[in-house]
């Protein structure tokens, strides 16, 4: 069990922008995604109608709770017009630096960038986490609706995931949220507007459609 005095999950990591303060040469999530993109982008098509799904073997210490087939089945529930131009969905491997800093404030489930969705594997050490300061109510609601166990104990708020709840989190929330950023990519307004749309998108096409 991991105790996090000020631990913040980036439940739906930000859509990457050129001026994103965390988009630096030291961000291990960005570095892994950039390498994966560079390995495959020369095979992308300008007129993509459905995304490629590219899965890397998961590193020790991580769990990728979804398979390429499950991702494909989930995206089939999204109206086709929202998938046009989406080049790829990457299921990444994780890195040692990510694992070392898993309890820090840069933890990321995934993000949208360059017409691609990148999903990061989940550190096994975070399957059970203690928050001495309770997560935001909206995050607790998201954890609860995927079936995570949430309890209040003497040390703080405890969130426990099993494989089933983590799979639901990735498929119905994180993945569809990031596809929502793709659907809303022409909107260059305030980031809060982008996040509100992506959150609505995940509710509409992740939870309501997938049940």
Tell me what each language-model feature is.
Residues 126-129, 183-184, 191:
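Short catalytic/ligand-binding loop motif for oxyanion handling, primarily in non-cytosolic enzymes
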Residues 191-211:
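Post-HExxH zinc-binding segment in Zn-dependent metallohydrolases
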């Amino acid at each position: 069990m991991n105790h996090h005095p000020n631990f913040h999950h980036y439940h739906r990591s930000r859509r990457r922008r050129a001026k994103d303060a965390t988009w630096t040469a030291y961000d291990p999530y960005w570095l892994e995604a950039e390498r994966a993109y560079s390995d495959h982008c020369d095979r992308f098509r300008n007129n993509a109608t459905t995304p490629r799904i590219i899965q890397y073997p998961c590193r020790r210490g991580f769990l990728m709770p979804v398979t390429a087939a499950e991702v494909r089945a989930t995206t089939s529930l999204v109206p086709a017009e929202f998938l046009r131009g989406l080049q790829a969905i990457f299921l990444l491997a994780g890195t040692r630096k990510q694992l070392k800093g898993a309890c820090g404030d840069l933890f990321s489930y995934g993000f949208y960038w360059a017409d691609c969705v990148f999903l990061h594997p989940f550190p096994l050490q975070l399957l059970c986490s203690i928050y001495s300061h309770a997560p935001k109510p909206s995050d607790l609601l998201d954890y609860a609706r995927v079936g995570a166990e949430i309890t209040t104990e003497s040390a703080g708020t405890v969130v426990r995931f099993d494989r089933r709840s983590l799979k639901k989190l990735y498929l119905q929330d994180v993945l569809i949220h990031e596809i929502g950023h793709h659907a809303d990519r022409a909107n260059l307004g305030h980031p809060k507007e982008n996040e509100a749309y992506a959150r609505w998108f995940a509710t509409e096409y992740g939870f309501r459609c997938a049940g």
